Amino acid sequence: MIGKLKGTLDEIDEDHCLVDIHGVGYVAYCSARTLAALPSPGEAVVLFIETYVREDMLRLYGFQSALEREWFRLLLNNVPGVGAKVALAILSTLAPADLANAIALRDIAMVSRAPGVGKKVAERIVTELKNKAPAYAGAASGTIGLKQELGEGVAPAPITDAVSALVNLGYSRDTAANAVAAALKTAGEDADASKLIRFGLKELAR
């Protein structure tokens, strides 16, 4: 089982790249985001690898980060009807943090922006992964957890009121949730809505 490739980038194609390791070329299929982040051919490259084995095929999928690979696994192993091609399309359209945000907020429209992902598939992704998003949110896990509470309507009243107030001021729901999450760290978990709004506006002014 191959978990990582470290070698020289030989070439980049539309949906894959070729990595040379001591004279052996490895083809790794990648998301558009990973391909865009690759260095120029001839330079050193490191890819996190998921080895996909079927009766008639062995294929390597490459990712620029371990977190992106974890999301690929999450989509592939937990959402019926989502194969490798669709999972890569999703990760080409949404960065892991954006995907976690969309799932936490139950933003079907955001998830369905990926090619090949219709409304039904997007709904299935949100339903199947809503409880897993915070654990796979990377550094933004606290913010994702708050957004999940907002999406489920179970966030404490001061938080809900603060987010609503910022939205009424013209900020997007996602931006408002980020600001309030940051405000919570400064103002404390027991802060009232007015304090969260005040600290949230300070965050937005930075």
UniProtKB/Swiss-Prot annotation:
GO terms for molecular function: ATP binding; four-way junction DNA binding; four-way junction helicase activity. The keyword DNA-binding applies. Residues 145-154 are annotated as: Flexible linker. Residues 1-64 are annotated as: Domain I. Its main location: cytoplasm. One of its GO terms (biological process) is DNA repair. Signal peptide: none annotated. One of its GO terms (cellular component) is cytoplasm. InterPro entries: DNA_helicase_Holl-junc_RuvA_I, NA-bd_OB-fold, RuvA, RuvA_2-like, RuvA_C, RuvA_C_sf. It comes from the Bacteria. Residues 65-144 are annotated as: Domain II. Residues 154-206 are annotated as: Domain III. It is found in: Cytoplasm. Keywords: Cytoplasm, DNA damage, DNA recombination, DNA repair, DNA-binding. Has three domains with a flexible linker between the domains II and III and assumes an 'L' shape. Domain III is highly mobile and contacts RuvB. The RuvA-RuvB-RuvC complex processes Holliday junction (HJ) DNA during genetic recombination and DNA repair, while the RuvA-RuvB complex plays an important role in the rescue of blocked DNA replication forks via replication fork reversal (RFR). RuvA specifically binds to HJ cruciform DNA, conferring on it an open structure. The RuvB hexamer acts as an ATP-dependent pump, pulling dsDNA into and through the RuvAB complex. HJ branch migration allows RuvC to scan DNA until it finds its consensus sequence, where it cleaves and resolves the cruciform DNA. Belongs to the RuvA family. Homotetramer. Forms an RuvA(8)-RuvB(12)-Holliday junction (HJ) complex. HJ DNA is sandwiched between 2 RuvA tetramers; dsDNA enters through RuvA and exits via RuvB. An RuvB hexamer assembles on each DNA strand where it exits the tetramer. Each RuvB hexamer is contacted by two RuvA subunits (via domain III) on 2 adjacent RuvB subunits; this complex drives branch migration. In the full resolvosome a probable DNA-RuvA(4)-RuvB(12)-RuvC(2) complex forms which resolves the HJ. NCBIfam families: ruvA. This is Holliday junction branch migration complex subunit RuvA.
